[in-house]
Swiss-Prot record:
Gene: rplS
Name of the protein this chain belongs to: Large ribosomal subunit protein bL19
Organism field: Synechococcus sp. (strain CC9902)
Keyword field: Ribonucleoprotein, Ribosomal protein
Lineage: Bacteria, Bacillati, Cyanobacteriota, Cyanophyceae, Synechococcales
Classification via InterPro entries: Ribosomal_bL19, Ribosomal_bL19_CS, Ribosomal_bL19_sf, Translation_prot_SH3-like_sf
Cellular component, GO annotation: cytosolic large ribosomal subunit
């Protein structure tokens, strides 16, 4: 019984996957804290105005985490002048200067989309002290 040789396309694909994996690992940030849904975080966003660049903080509750690796995103929600504002940040993006966890939240859901319907004190998340 003769064994079949691997097609050349499959080995090329494997090499391409390895190249992509190496490139992504070089681009990933290593100084990020552990971020959980329910945490209150402060994200430093790089903003370029003309020829100047500054870092603008954006603070809010993490209501969602998606994907993993290079494509990991977090959705941060805050209340600004009585209106809920959500921003989605790619964690490993060069536009994100830093992420700091201000306080840990104690929640029992993976996604906190129910906070969108809540108003005022009902949007508060209990604090967790053990992490």
């Amino acid at each position: 019984m003769a064994t079949k040789a691997k097609p050349a396309a499959a080995s090329k694909k494997l090499c391409a996957e390895e190249l992509i994996r190496e490139f992504e690992s070089a681009q990933q940030k290593t100084d990020l804290p552990e971020i959980y849904v329910g945490d209150t975080v402060r994200v430093g966003v790089r903003i370029s105005e003309g020829n100047r660049e500054r870092v603008q903080p954006y603070e809010g509750v993490v209501i969602s985490k998606r994907h993993g690796g290079m494509n990991q995103t977090i959705t941060v929600r805050r209340i600004f002048q009585g209106i809920g504002v959500e921003r989605v940040f790619m964690v490993h993006s060069p536009q994100v200067a830093n992420i700091k966890v201000e306080r840990r939240g104690k929640v029992r859901r993976a996604k906190l989309f129910y906070l969108r319907e809540r108003v005022g004190k009902a949007t508060r998340v209990k604090q967790r002290f053990d992490r």
